């Protein structure tokens, strides 16, 4: 019988497929992860409300928000530790919400490391590798032909099932259009649609699951001990833990444990690495080292990182884009620079960094009024005489004891090492300013700024202006 052969020596290195190579199998250039109309509820409480977002391959994404905003829930939904009530979780265009965590293209690092204390560093890293399979290098042509025939049968079955579900869902949606439905009937039909959508997700992945099962049985093999040892060595070098393979977990520092957790997750070659506040328990110096390590590894391996944190500085320094979450909704999803310089609304401006916020009136093109004076602005996108929110960042304000646009009085200052954070009262509005020069309490000073330093936003109610943040000041 003819066969397809190559070197099968146990000393050869197993085929290592990086996430960047896998993404090249995505000819339509689809997002690696897409959440579409995701809703998550616990009883009567809505945790996520109709979330939509799209993440590109090889991005470093940070989910940032206050406690209870829903950021960890988003991560858990992507990882398969939670299931949505409705909506789609798409991986390269295919809904994976029905798949359990071990069938998803992701690996997760938790805040508490989740290492096995009875295993050594090497044992922890090998844990996932013992389940990993690599393609056989000597497969009979008849076996490949059988596999191809089975794939065609599986595809036909899946297509028929999805067509049936399409018709069922359309029927339910038509029934939902009736104005005569009671709330109970409407809820019942919506639940049927939600349940059938999970069935649809299963059949979307049916062929891949069958192919994996067949391949594991007939077309692949487990890694040899030598191959696992090589991968462990490679991972320890990657996370700078050479020489610690035999170390006991309880003998490691917090930073070293986090590196082991990182090595274990990367060893199984996920497309997506999910990180749930992994650095929050580390001291400042070790935390900075781990931030650099994560950034370097993400760039080197060209993986997609989705990182949850409450640390704004960490998010700005590490991310390609940041998802700002508030009360189960996405307030803004943009680059760190755009979120800082051009926040969507007053809440985002207040949440990210120091902010000088006050009510203003957009008078006409390039003219805005606040604090009883009229100033020039770069903005041209509002209707005349519209009430808006105005933002000036502390570092954009120029302080002088001689002249400026407005006059104020120094009320408080905090020394930050290379600069001072100074509070200046202007017309009963408290300004926060960064300055390298020291000013005495109650000293009169003048403030000015460049034309493009004033950012105008649509008026947002229910969020205070210039609320003093004691953690920041």
Curated annotation (Swiss-Prot):
Part of the ABC transporter complex PotABCD involved in spermidine/putrescine import. Responsible for energy coupling to the transport system. Belongs to the ABC transporter superfamily. Spermidine/putrescine importer (TC 3.A.1.11.1) family. The gene is potA. It comes from Mycoplasma mobile (strain ATCC 43663 / 163K / NCTC 11711). ATP binds at residues 65-72. Residues 1-21 are annotated as: Disordered. Residues 133-221 are annotated as: Insert. It is found in: Cell membrane. The complex is composed of two ATP-binding proteins (PotA), two transmembrane proteins (PotB and PotC) and a solute-binding protein (PotD). Residues 33-352 form the ABC transporter domain. Residues 1-13 have a biased composition (Low complexity). This is Spermidine/putrescine import ATP-binding protein PotA.
């Amino acid at each position: 019988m003819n066969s397809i052969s190559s070197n099968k020596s146990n000393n050869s290195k197993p085929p290592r497929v990086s996430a960047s190579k896998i993404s090249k199998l995505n000819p339509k250039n689809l997002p690696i992860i897409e959440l579409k109309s995701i809703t998550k509820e616990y009883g009567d409480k809505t945790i996520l409300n109709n979330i939509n977002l799209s993440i590109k391959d090889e991005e470093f994404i940070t989910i940032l928000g206050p406690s209870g905003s829903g950021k960890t829930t988003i991560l858990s939904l992507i990882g398969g530790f939670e299931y949505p009530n409705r909506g789609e979780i798409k991986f390269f265009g295919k809904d994976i919400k029905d798949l359990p965590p071990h069938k998803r293209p992701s690996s997760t690092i938790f805040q508490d490391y989740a290492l096995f204390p009875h295993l050594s560093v090497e044992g922890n890293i090998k844990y996932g590798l013992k389940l990993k399979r690599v393609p056989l290098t000597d497969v009979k042509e008849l076996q490949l032909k059988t596999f191809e025939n089975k794939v065609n049968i599986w595809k036909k079955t899946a297509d028929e099932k999805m067509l049936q579900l399409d018709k069922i869902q359309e029927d339910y949606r038509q029934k939902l259009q009736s104005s005569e439905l009671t709330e109970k009937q409407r809820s019942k039909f919506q639940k049927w649609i939600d349940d059938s959508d999970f069935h649809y997700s299963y059949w979307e992945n049916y062929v891949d699951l069958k192919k994996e099962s067949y391949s594991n049985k007939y077309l692949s093999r487990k890694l040899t001990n030598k191959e696992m040892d090589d991968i462990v060595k490679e991972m320890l070098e990657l996370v700078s833990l050479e020489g610690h393979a035999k170390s006991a977990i309880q003998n490691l520092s917090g930073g070293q444990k986090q590196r082991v957790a990182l090595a274990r997750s990367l060893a199984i070659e996920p497309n997506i690495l999910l990180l749930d506040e992994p650095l929050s328990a580390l001291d400042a110096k070790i935390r900075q080292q781990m931030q650099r390590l994560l950034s370097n590894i993400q760039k080197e391996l060209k993986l997609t990182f989705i990182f949850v944190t409450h640390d704004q500085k960490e998010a700005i320094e590490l991310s390609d884009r940041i998802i700002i979450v508030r009360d189960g909704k996405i307030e803004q999803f943009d680059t760190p620079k755009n979120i800082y310089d051009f926040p969507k609304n007053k809440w985002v401006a207040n949440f990210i960094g120091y902010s000088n916020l006050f009510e203003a009136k957009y008078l006409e093109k390039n003219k805005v009024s606040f604090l009883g004076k009229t100033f020039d602005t770069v903005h041209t996108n509002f209707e005349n005489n519209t009430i808006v929110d105005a933002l000036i960042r502390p570092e954009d304000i120029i302080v002088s004891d001689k002249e400026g646009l407005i006059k104020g009085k120094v009320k408080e200052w905090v020394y930050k090492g290379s600069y001072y954070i100074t509070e200046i009262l202007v017309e009963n509005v408290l300004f926060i300013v960064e300055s390298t020069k020291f000013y005495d309490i109650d000293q009169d000073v003048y403030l000015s700024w460049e034309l493009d330093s004033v950012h105008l936003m649509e008026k947002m109610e229910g969020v205070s202006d210039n609320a003093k943040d004691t953690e920041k000041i």
